[in-house]
Amino acid sequence: MGFMKNFFSQTRKPEGLLGKFMLGMMNYGHAKLADWGMGHLSEITPKEIIELGCGAGRDAGELLKRYPDARLTAIDYSPLSVEKAAEYNKAMIGSGRCKVQQGDVSDLQFEENSYDLATAFETIYFWPGLERCFAQVAKILKQGGYFLICNESDGKDAAGKKFENIIDGMICYTPRQIEDELKRAGFSEITTDHHPKKPWITILARK
């Protein structure tokens, strides 16, 4: 259990050799979920995007492809994730369309009302207090801006419960729990979609 716990705990804050391996797996393993989640953005044309908990950078790259006129800021509190995400999106960084930096979702150091879209793929499990973090997201979104959350766990599936027991600090939230915290943080027009065959959930909230 010691090795397994250490390995899967890399999903929370990747570091070292195991973290590098995990980040590579996450880019591949989360791709289908992220693409499904992005499919819920068909009516949105953001110019300024922030990705929260960017991991190794694959989803940031896909968002930049989806929105060729947008600029994106990607943050993660893992220095290794920031390094790998910057490598993955090197060309976009060079063109001036992408920035990757270390950041803390509980204390977002960005101008208020500056983003049209915020995304969080497979990350809120580890956020230190949803209402506080969601309020930080609301603060930096423009009025009418959107917040997209995508999770592989709906808070009730067996796999999610298993990983909660392995990874310290991981919480798999139900859609209702997420919706309630979003409302408390000031979001409205909250739409939840549950995958028909998997425990995946996508929640899209508007400020």
Feature roles, as predicted:
Residues L117-L130:
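A short SAM/SAH-binding and catalytic strip from SAM-dependent methyltransferases
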